[in-house]
Amino acid sequence: LQDIINEFGGAMPQTFGVPVEEIVRGIKMGVRKVNIDTDCRMRMTGQFRRIAEQNKAEFDPRKFLKPAMDAMRDLCKARLEAFGTAGHASKIKVIPMDDMAKRYASGSLAPKTN
């Protein structure tokens, strides 16, 4: 992801995230919270830069946004499949906003330590 940004004019210093394989291993060992926002932002940024470089006369932001969103969607899909979470949306129980507001107001969602 970083290489694409830099290939098309970016100047990101070398960074290292957690490889997908290690995240998958962590999930198998009980990790339940995984963040992929940085990867999503980097994927979109790389696509914006690629399009700007390859189409220097383009100024319509819609021409940048659609392929960038498609690239981010593809990255999310690949991550969700790798993490074993694809296809589970129907198992999520919707909680109405009013119910969540009551939970927050009652303090039942406040962090607790033992």
Curated annotation (Swiss-Prot):
Leading EC class: lyase
Signal peptide positions on this chain: none
Residues the entry annotates as binding dihydroxyacetone phosphate: 35-38
Catalytic activity, as annotated: beta-D-fructose 1,6-bisphosphate = D-glyceraldehyde 3-phosphate + dihydroxyacetone phosphate
Cofactor(s) required for function per UniProt: Zn(2+)
Pfam families: F_bP_aldolase (PF01116)
Pathway assigned in UniProt: Carbohydrate biosynthesis; Calvin cycle; Carbohydrate degradation; glycolysis; D-glyceraldehyde 3-phosphate and glycerone phosphate from D-glucose: step 4/4
Cofactor binding note from Swiss-Prot or TrEMBL: Binds 2 Zn(2+) ions per subunit. One is catalytic and the other provides a structural contribution.
GO biological process: glycolytic process; reductive pentose-phosphate cycle
Keyword vocabulary terms for this entry: Calvin cycle, Glycolysis, Lyase, Zinc
Keyword Lyase carried by entry: yes
GO MF terms held by the record: fructose-bisphosphate aldolase activity; zinc ion binding
SUPFAM superfamilies, per database record: Aldolase (SSF51569)
EC number: 4.1.2.13
Note: This protein is encoded within the form II ribulose-bisphosphate carboxylase operon.
Family to which this protein belongs: Belongs to the class II fructose-bisphosphate aldolase family.
Subunit organization: Homodimer.
Annotated function: Catalyzes the aldol condensation of dihydroxyacetone phosphate (DHAP or glycerone-phosphate) with glyceraldehyde 3-phosphate (G3P) to form fructose 1,6-bisphosphate (FBP) in gluconeogenesis and the reverse reaction in glycolysis.
PANTHER family: D-TAGATOSE-1,6-BISPHOSPHATE ALDOLASE (PTHR30304), D-TAGATOSE-1,6-BISPHOSPHATE ALDOLASE SUBUNIT GATY-RELATED (PTHR30304:SF0)
Protein name as annotated: Fructose-bisphosphate aldolase 2
Gene name of the record: cbbA
